Amino acid sequence: MKLSMRLISAVLIMFMIFVATGMGPVTVEARTCESQSHRFKGTCVSASNCANVCHNEGFVGGNCRGFRRRCFCTRHC
């Protein structure tokens, strides 16, 4: 009987810990909007160069993407 009470207690504590870890604060991520850069010229090869041009345009960052390798600027919607 003692062993089964310990086992039940241990299982109950593990269950409570498992449930408590999933109930933490939830952070909400902002959506990301994209727009093609107006000032970037040529084929986009360097993502850091694209990001610098996008920063000068007032965006948060930028990435090279697509088959034609264009620079797309990103910002929070």
Swiss-Prot record:
It is found in: Secreted. The keyword Nucleus does not apply. Pfam families: Gamma-thionin. GO terms for cellular component: extracellular region; mitochondrion; plant-type cell wall; plasma membrane. Broadly expressed. GO terms for biological process: defense response; defense response to fungus; killing of cells of another organism. Residues 1-30 form the signal peptide. Disulfide bonds join C33-C77, C44-C64, C50-C71, C54-C73. InterPro entries: Defensin_plant (IPR008176), Scorpion_toxin-like (IPR003614), Scorpion_toxin-like_sf (IPR036574). CDD domains: Knot1 (cd00107). Gene3D superfamilies: Knottin, scorpion toxin-like. Its main location: secreted. Keywords: Antimicrobial, Disulfide bond, Fungicide, Plant defense, Secreted, Signal. Confers broad-spectrum resistance to pathogens. PANTHER family: DEFENSIN-LIKE PROTEIN 1, DEFENSIN-LIKE PROTEIN 2-RELATED. Belongs to the DEFL family. This is Defensin-like protein 2. It comes from Arabidopsis thaliana.
